[in-house]
């Protein structure tokens, strides 16, 4: 009996082995699926994340892969175009790059679709500190306009500009690029500025505040110092909500090491949460 069982296992092993060691055909054969993350690709530790793999045609089996691993990290056997992979209470160790593939039973052993585009999951308490620079430079001629660029490391983030002595955010931009530009009119450009960025939706993850940047008239000379030592500068407040939307709970986006100050009720004079493209700045 034991000999029969061993022979059966040896017979099944090639089929099982080829199923977890995928053979990828040319792209024209089986188009790649789409891989997305809910609630976001950037989350804080402890959040439940769902990775969704959507195939362009009904499939039978889906596999979730990480680079350097031959076998799928997770399997889902579903007779549909969508499979969900659940990552509960994620940790920083679960961050990284993911891809997914799908296959059908009539494709033969080990044949999978083209892999999806890369999805990078970032699990962190706070985002890296951005840089703040002036274009063309921090020393401007009288009446000249200046552009401030707040640059982070991630695309599709929301950027906030602060000015020393002003409690409310000065300008707010959402950018598909890993940076955002803020235009200051020459007559009001001189001053001390800092910026930060955050994920555009809850659960919010905030960056550290940038170092301050001093804009001055020619002959005055700029100076730079850490934002934490700048008088009148507060730690980043919570991301402003969309007009008409309920502001998220402050505790839902409190990053480690930051003391968040709630935003005061905003007026058109103090804050425009979504300046139009033609807005010349402050």
UniProtKB/Swiss-Prot annotation:
Keywords: Cell membrane, Disulfide bond, Glycoprotein, Immunoglobulin domain, Membrane, Receptor, Repeat, Secreted, Signal, Transmembrane, Transmembrane helix. One of its GO terms (molecular function) is collagen receptor activity. Regulator of osteoclastogenesis which plays an important bone-specific function in osteoclast differentiation. Glycans are attached at residues 48, 145. SMART domains: IG. Disulfide bonds join 53-100. The keyword Transmembrane helix applies. Residues 1-18 form the signal peptide. The gene is OSCAR. It comes from the Eukaryota. Belongs to the leukocyte receptor complex/polymeric immunoglobulin receptor (PIR/LRC) family. InterPro entries: Ig-like_dom_sf, Ig-like_fold, Ig-like_Receptors_ImmuneReg, Ig_sub. One of its GO terms (biological process) is immune response-regulating signaling pathway. The keyword Signal applies. Pfam families: Ig_2. GO terms for cellular component: extracellular exosome; extracellular region; plasma membrane; specific granule lumen; tertiary granule lumen. This is Osteoclast-associated immunoglobulin-like receptor. Residues 221-282 are annotated as: Disordered. Residues 273-282 have a biased composition (Pro residues). Residues 22-116, 126-219 form the Ig-like domain.
């Amino acid at each position: 009996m034991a000999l029969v069982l061993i022979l059966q296992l040896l017979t099944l092993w090639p089929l099982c082995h080829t199923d977890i060691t995928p053979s990828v055909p040319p792209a024209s054969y089986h188009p790649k699926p789409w891989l997305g993350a809910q609630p976001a690709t950037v989350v804080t530790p402890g959040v439940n994340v769902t990775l969704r793999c959507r195939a362009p045609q009904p499939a039978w089996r889906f596999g979730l892969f990480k680079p350097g691993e031959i076998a799928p990290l997770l399997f889902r056997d579903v007779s549909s175009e969508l499979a969900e992979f659940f990552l509960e209470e994620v940790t920083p160790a679960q961050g990284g790059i993911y891809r997914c593939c799908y296959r059908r039973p009539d494709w033969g052993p080990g044949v999978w679709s083209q892999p999806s585009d890369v999805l990078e999951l970032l699990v962190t308490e706070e985002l890296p500190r951005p840089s703040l620079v002036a274009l063309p430079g921090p020393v401007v001629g009288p009446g000249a306009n200046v552009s401030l660029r707040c640059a982070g490391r991630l695309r599709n983030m929301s950027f906030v500009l602060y000015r020393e002595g002003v409690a409310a955010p000065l300008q707010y931009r959402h950018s598909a690029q890993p940076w955002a530009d803020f235009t200051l009119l020459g007559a009001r450009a001189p001053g001390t500025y800092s910026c930060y960025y955050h994920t555009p939706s809850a659960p919010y993850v905030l960056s550290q505040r940038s170092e301050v940047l001093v804009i001055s008239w020619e002959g005055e000379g700029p100076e730079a110092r850490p934002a934490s030592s700048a008088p009148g500068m507060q730690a980043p407040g919570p991301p402003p909500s969309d007009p008409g939307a309920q502001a998220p709970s402050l505790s839902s986006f409190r990053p480690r090491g930051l003391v968040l100050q709630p935003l005061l009720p905003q007026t058109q004079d103090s804050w425009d949460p979504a300046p139009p493209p033609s807005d010349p700045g402050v």
